[in-house]
Amino acid sequence: MTARFVARAVLIDLDGTLVDSLPDLACAANSMRADLGLPLLPVDQIASYVGKGVDVLVHRALTETMEGQAPPAAFQRGKQSFNRHYSQVNGNQSRVYPGVHQALEDLRGKAIALACVTNKPRSFTLQLLERMDLKMAFTAIVSGDDTEQKKPHGEPMLHACQLLGVAAPDATVIGDSENDVLAARAAGCQVIVVETGYNEGKSLANLGADAIVPTLLHAARLIEPRPH
């Protein structure tokens, strides 16, 4: 596969890109609904709710709509319940996608700095990365509560670049969703989308990514180090 990207750093999304975390997210969301006396939802439906952080996932899972806002009291009860359940199951059924460890090893072997950039809260991010044996691959980790704005805003990507000491145009983002593409564009980074993830149930074809590839390993093979 011919290299198409030259970078000093690669910024990688977590859920849907590195790890299939849907089983545990769905378990926690349905446990939350059960606590509030609501019927369980199909996993595929919950999959469409993933990608914009815990608060949005809770609102969507409570209202069963993409743009819904649960009443404040219900939201607070729901979020507390979700966090409690997710802290107990985070990583239990989640799985690292095939080729991810090799992709990270290949990128590090090219002396490309790596950051994980996710909308997931930091406590859950570190818990999952550690359980999946991925944490040590990353020089920097930017979670959903580390910056004022989350993806699709560009701030998390810019913060990751700052932590790695690289300019945004020298970084390539790899993610699975529109959030990642919009955040990359806002920050001034190139972006590759992988087909392993969720993207709120929408097609990847019209996102405007620089490339769409099957897996993280395919993405890693497109990237070569930028000479210093």
Language model region names:
Residues 39, 110, 134-139, 167, ...:
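Conserved H-loop
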Residues 32-33, 53-70, 128, 160-161:
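Helix-loop "lid/cap" segments that line or gate small-molecule binding pockets
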Residues 36, 61-105:
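Metal-dependent phosphoesterase signature
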Residues 5-7, 87-116, 122-126, 154:
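Short, acidic loop-to-helix structural element flanking the phosphoryl-transfer center
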Residues 150-181:
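Conserved Lys-Pro-Asp/Glu-containing loop-to-beta segment of HAD-superfamily phosphomonoesterases
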Residues 172-211:
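Acidic, Mg2+-coordinating phosphoryl-transfer loop and its flanking beta/alpha structural elements
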Residues 2-48, 54-55, 59:
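Active-site neighborhood of HAD-like aspartate-dependent phosphohydrolases
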